Amino acid sequence: MKKAVIGLGFGDEGKGITTDYLCSIVKNPLVVRFSGGHQAGHTVCNVETRHKFSNFGSGTLRGVPTYWSENCTVDPVGLLKEFRALEDKGIHPIIYINANCPITTPYDKRANRVSDSNKKHGTVGVGFGSTIQREEDHYSLTFQDLFHQFVLATKLDMIEQYYEFPILSHSYYEFIHACSQIIKLGLFIRLVHEMPHFDNYIYEGSQGLMLDPKIGFFPHVTRSNIFIEGMDKYYFITRAYCTRHGNGAMPNEDIPYNITVNPNETNVTHEYQGKFRRTMLDVSLLKYAIEKTNVKG
C-alpha cells in the first residue's frame, strides 16, 4: 500500500511526526522522499531521542529505511553529518539513493546565499534552489557521478565555470571528503537504480501545498512539486494555526491572535529564511489546497 503525507499550508505542519506514526502501524514499511531534498527539517521525538531529519526519512528512529527518489537533491556534506549524528544516538540508518539524484555542491550553497533574488523570494540557504536551476541548465551532477573520480572532478570544474566564482578551499575539500566517505558507507548508504520492494510505502512530502509552483503564490514558491498522484491514501497535514517561514502572502495577519509559542518548536527566525510567522488558521485556504489536488473523499 502507498500512503502520502502532504502538508496543506506553507510547510512546517508536522509531516515528520505523522510519517513516524504511520511507520509504527504498518508492516515492513519504507519511507519514500519524493520531492524537495535536503532542505527539509522534519522533527521526530520518542522517549529517548529527538532528531530533525533533513537527509533521511522520518521513520529512521524506528529502524525504517529510506528511499531517496531521483526528484530529490542530495547534499553529501549534510548527509554524512546527519549519518554520524544518528550513529552517535545509537541509530544505524539505511538509505537507498537513486543514482540520478541531483547533487548539491558548495557552489550551489554559495549561490543560494548571495543571490538577491533568493533573499527576496525566500531561501533556506542550503543550495536547493540553485541545484535545481543548474540541473535545468544542463550542468548536471548526480549521485552516481560521485563513484567515478574523473567524472566528479570534471563536472565540478564545469560547475565552477557555470557560476563564475570560486569557493573556499575548505568547502571544496570538505565536499570531496564527504563524497569519499559516503562511498565507503555502502552498507548503509546504498546506490540504487530503482525503488526496492517493501510491503508498505510511506511517501513523506516536503514543505506544503501552498508552496507548490502550481498552487501557491509565485514567486514565493519552491522549485519542486509538493503533490504526488497515484496514492492509495492521502494524509493532509495542518497545525491548528497557520505558519510560514520567510516572505510571501499569508492569511489573517491583520487579525490579532494569542498563539503560545511551543517551547519545543523547531522552527525559529532563520538567517536566510527570515522570521517564522504565525496567524489564525484559514480553513478556506486548506480547502482550496485540497481542491487543487483533485483528491476526492
Walk through the language-model features, giving the residues of each.
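Non-transmembrane, aqueous-exposed alpha-helical and coiled segments at domain scale
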Residues: 1-297
